Amino acid sequence: MTEVPWSVVPNGTDAAFLAGLGSLWGNSTVASTAAVSSSFQCALTKTGFQFYYLPAVYILVFIIGFLGNSVAIWMFVFHMKPWSGISVYMFNLALADFLYVLTLPALIFYYFNKTDWIFGDAMCKLQRFIFHVNLYGSILFLTCISAHRYSGVVYPLKSLGRLKKKNAIYVSVLVWLIVVVAISPILFYSGTGTRKNKTVTCYDTTSNDYLRSYFIYSMCTTVAMFCIPLVLILGCYGLIVKALIYNDLDNSPLRRKSIYLVIIVLTVFAVSYIPFHVMKTMNLRARLDFQTPEMCDFNDRVYATYQVTRGLASLNSCVDPILYFLAGDTFRRRLSRATRKASRRSEANLQSKSEEMTLNILSEFKQNGDTSL
């Protein structure tokens, strides 16, 4: 997050309010705090490690995420028909990841260019919008996958009607609508800004002018689209594990797929989503309320850690394809079949070309032999 220096007071209104309270109460501490807050700004981290760390992570995510999700989409479209309910959710998850990795080349260039954004304000807004759509779309689709697997394991007979592909399509459309509507304020809050050295930054949160309202929006989004889904997922997995323990499902495909699902999804949350949301909230709070000289070192560490978690948050686009491979026997089986078929086709083409080349050589040899006679 390369932004203008932090300030506790986006537009000066809060500082004037605090100073007025200090004068009214005769409290010099409040008044002096307001004066310091209105004039003092902690500098951002001086290490510049994000110029190297973030592009390196994004390059890795782009390569692995592009290949993995391209294969996943190809499999779902051409080799996974007819779809099951869980296939619908996985396809939408792969689509969200694929759309996100397509935006990474511009972001990689941005950091190699010392965070000087050259692609315009609209592209900056679109970049941040797609990141958040992928982030929360992935969380909600993982929640749908977890709830689907919970119904199939805990209530295998009662859930037969609810787990149909048609219902999964309706739920997926609803998820996309919820995410797009909930994330649309990002198009207002994000954008570009010009620094004192005339370079252009692309805010990954917002400028100081809208920081306080953005913090409220961010907290609402975090609770509604991260905390609640996390609680639902943990509840589903607790009941799945309980059902696997008490039911005789030793070595069954359902047991194996369920265990893989629990491990992968919880790993994604532990590595990507939880650290990002914790540090994003701490960073916003530091920009708002911890702007004093003695807090600058703390703010600097918070900011640096937040940059690390931003890279981690993008790793889900690499991990999700592993979910399709390990948690879906059908996907793994059909991928193996499609790979063998493509390999045989390639071998047949090579053999055909080799035979054609041999015949051409023999033909030329005979012609040359005839003319020499």
Swiss-Prot record:
| Effect of loss of the gene | Platelets from mutant mice are defective in ADP-mediated platelet aggregation, leading to prolonged bleeding time. Otherwise, mice have no visible phenotype and do not display spontaneous bleeding.
Instruction: Report if keyword ATP-binding is assigned.
Output: yes
Topological domain (Extracellular) residues are: 1-51, 110-125, 189-214, 285-303
Under the heading InterPro entries, the entry gives: GPCR_Rhodpsn, GPCR_Rhodpsn_7TM, P2Y1_rcpt
Q: How does it sit in the bilayer?
A: Multi-pass membrane protein
Q: List locations, semicolon-separated.
A: Cell membrane
Q: Name one GO biological process term.
A: regulation of synaptic vesicle exocytosis
Keyword Transmembrane helix listed? The answer is yes
Query: In terms of one coarse class, where is the protein primarily found?
Result: membrane
Query: Which residues bear sugar attachments?
Result: N11, N27, N113, N197
Lineage, top-rank taxon, reads Eukaryota
Disulphides: C42-C296, C124-C202
Q: Which CDD domains does the record cross-reference, listed alphabetically?
A: 7tmA_P2Y1
> Family assignment?
Belongs to the G-protein coupled receptor 1 family.
Query: What is its biological role?
Result: Receptor for extracellular adenine nucleotides such as ADP. In platelets, binding to ADP leads to mobilization of intracellular calcium ions via activation of phospholipase C, a change in platelet shape, and ultimately platelet aggregation.
Identification of the protein by name: P2Y purinoceptor 1
Record gene name: P2ry1
